[in-house]
A protein has these predicted regions:
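Short acidic-glycine-tyrosine-enriched beta hairpin
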Residues: 79-95
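Ligand-binding loop in jelly-roll beta-barrel domains
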Residues: 89, 95-115
């Protein structure tokens, strides 16, 4: 459950508070939204995302920062570089980056999308 006022957003999460996360008409994992907009209409999205092992293309449609909480995720960038995220790792990607994500172990992240 998320509470959002003009001054802050606060969330308490249970398993039932996640919903399908849909990209390009396909559900890829589940999301719990903490915040869905910034001040004065600015793009600012914050949430938790979780997934069982799977692989899928993921275009970064805005700047995104990821803090890995559980499991392992391998992000293959179009440049050929691989970014592996495990609990405690933080990575930030710029808008327009094309990637393929491979969840190798059940994975959970906190994410912030801006731009």
């Amino acid at each position: 459950m998320t509470t959002q006022t003009a001054e802050y957003a606060r969330s308490l999460i249970t398993a039932e508070d996640f919903e399908p996360f849909v990209v390009g008409g396909e559900a890829i994992g589940e999301v719990h939204w903490i915040r869905t907009e910034g001040a004065e209409g600015a793009t600012l999205v914050v949430g938790l995302w979780r997934s069982e092992p799977q692989s899928f293309p993921y275009p970064f449609t805005a700047d995104e920062t990821i803090h890995a909480l559980e499991g392992e995720l391998v992000i293959d960038l179009e440049s050929g570089e691989k970014v592996t995220l495990r609990p405690g790792d933080i990575a930030s990607f710029i808008k327009g980056t094309k990637s393929t994500w491979t969840v190798t172990q059940p994975f959970k992240k906190l994410f912030v999308i801006s731009g």
